């Protein structure tokens, strides 16, 4: 049987051959062939890769790895020599009912560790959720009730299943070990930690300076989170880059407990689909939920700005770096249309969550609905001068200036359903669509226009606003 290195190499050779010869990834058997290769890769046994190869495969998708990639390779080597599994910790506080693809980035790495033969411990922070992670917050937040937590937990496991083999993973609640802890035990942990380590955090300093509130519970959040690492004796912890300071506290508390500090693997926080620079977030409406229907996963990713393609391909797919580099090279040389590359991304993510057939059905439906429509060919479209009406909100343009939508309420409902869009078309046939949110609907048109300047200011671009069937051209 071929080893994993040889299998990965053969898989990559086959995929890159398709990329070099495919006339168009938007349709046809070439896209299906690539999706089948990637589906096989998601389940590929990686246990016989060398420790260095394994460490490099993990590091390729991380924003920061501490202490270093060589030390990860050493840990992998030692585990192999001792015939033991590394314990890989990954936790989420159930502060919301939905998980989005931004949360899936460390899950994808966790899957790789599973396929290397290691043990992933998926920790649901039912205790820490009551405190609430203070990272990046500018104000305090009411604690969650037990009912809130149980409601949010209901769909967690179902949503993350595409990324984990739960037959080889533990699914734990940190109340198992945190609820019984005594006050003397907790004080014993705290007395070994300098307060200055927490007060040096920029987010804490900002909140204290502004007088917006910082509870003692929030101050010790990272310490409580560290007790999870101590309990399971974590070798590795996965998390988003925003969790880096919390994970560094985990290393310190583990060392104080006489344990070897865990290796930190921090993944980047991916930008939201709206292309404004804000990170993916349900509150901003610029997210792709793991509970979305196939057509919605596909459609939301197809609406993402072209410039997000490199980031999304590296973070969300099983494509290897040379394959991504080739895709971007072919796109830059116009040998592949950007919409074809975006179709591959959308189909691959839909396939990961819902399966190959669902991805194909979503692609077919999207193509039938959108791909043949060019607004530049639509006759008698009302034109509105942005310089003249830029102070009006997007909603006011449709309701008051153009009179194409009967009310602001209807426009907001359309926006919440994903039907409010900014569409930019170039003379070469390119079309880029940006989904606008309810917030955008209440924002001045000039501000929305400026926020998407990289899209609307391309050479020869014609720009349109669509609300349901209502259409406006912006000049």
PLM region spans:
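Conserved nucleotide- and phosphate/pyrophosphate-binding catalytic cores
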Residues: 254-475
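A short, small-residue-rich loop immediately preceding and capping a beta-strand
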Residues: 87-91, 236-237
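Alpha-helical recognition segments enriched in aromatics with Gly/Pro capping
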Residues: 121-128, 153-168, 172-330, 348-350, ...
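N-terminal Rossmann-like or analogous alpha/beta NTP/dinucleotide-binding catalytic cores
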Residues: 2-87, 94-222
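Conserved aromatic-histidine-acidic binding/catalytic patches
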Residues: 98, 238-241, 337
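Short alpha-helical patches at coil-to-helix transitions and adjacent helical residues
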Residues: 103-107, 180, 243-247, 391, ...
